């Protein structure tokens, strides 16, 4: 047994470690939620990871994203995350796709089989498209709902999308998925009522087909999206390792 995973084996067993090492997991979105999900998956022993994000590290990411350091400003988030994971587990196979997910170009993002997909995309259209693609290909997926404008990480829960409440993003997702005939989707969502930002802020984004546009971002803090990402990873690890919570 590899020393770096011996403590993990005490919880999930050697058979669980073997399953994780053989698994190929895709993380869509390497931001405040996705960066923590990706690193937790790597530290748990997932052997093959595909990281999808077309964004570069910005100063506004420093308050919450694992990839954000002064030394990484301006660099590709996916590339920074890949280097970080390889420094944690040099044996891991890490691929990156530095592009924005669009359903009409799904083939670029689904090269080879995925055992699980983590949806940490922060646009409704992207999330809907990814869920539909995963369902079409019968790939397990867990999706993050809204983590912005919140201060209480203890309010996160894992539930089916149709059992969610409070979260505005989950409300939109319920409506859109129902209209498309999707019967179930595992999500991580918060029951905390979103706070109204104390002031408005505009920032450039590259999330519309790779073209920059101005948007109003939500308020964020270090200890909320990170927890959502860790919960996403926990769902994936338990299911891939064949574990259940008592």
Model-derived regions, located:
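Glycine-rich phosphate/adenylate-binding loop
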Residues: 2, 112-113, 126, 136, ...
């Amino acid at each position: 047994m590899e020393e770096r995973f011996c403590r993990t084996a005490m919880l999930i067993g050697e058979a669980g470690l073997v399953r994780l090492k053989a698994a190929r997991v895709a993380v869509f979105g390497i931001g405040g939620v996705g960066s923590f999900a990706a690193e937790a998956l790597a530290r748990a022993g997932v052997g093959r990871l595909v990281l999808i994000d077309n964004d570069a590290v910005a100063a506004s990411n420093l308050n919450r994203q694992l990839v954000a350091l002064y030394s990484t400003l301006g660099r590709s988030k996916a590339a920074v995350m890949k280097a970080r994971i390889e420094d944690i587990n040099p044996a891991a196979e890490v691929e990156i796709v530095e592009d924005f997910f669009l359903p009409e170009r799904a083939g670029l993002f689904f090269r080879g089989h995925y055992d699980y997909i983590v949806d940490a995309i922060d646009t409704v259209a992207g999330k809907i498209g990814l869920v539909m693609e995963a369902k079409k290909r019968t790939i397990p997926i867990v999706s993050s709902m809204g983590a912005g404008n919140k201060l209480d990480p203890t309010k996160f829960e894992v539930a089916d999308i149709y059992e969610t409440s409070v979260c505005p993003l989950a409300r939109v997702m319920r409506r859109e998925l129902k209209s498309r005939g999707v019967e179930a989707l595992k999500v991580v969502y918060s029951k905390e009522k979103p706070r109204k930002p104390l002031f408005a802020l505009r920032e450039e984004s590259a999330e519309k087909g790779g073209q920059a546009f101005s948007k109003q971002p939500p308020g964020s803090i270090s200890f909320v999206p990170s927890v959502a990402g860790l919960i996403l990873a926990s769902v994936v690890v338990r299911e891939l390792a064949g574990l259940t919570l008592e």
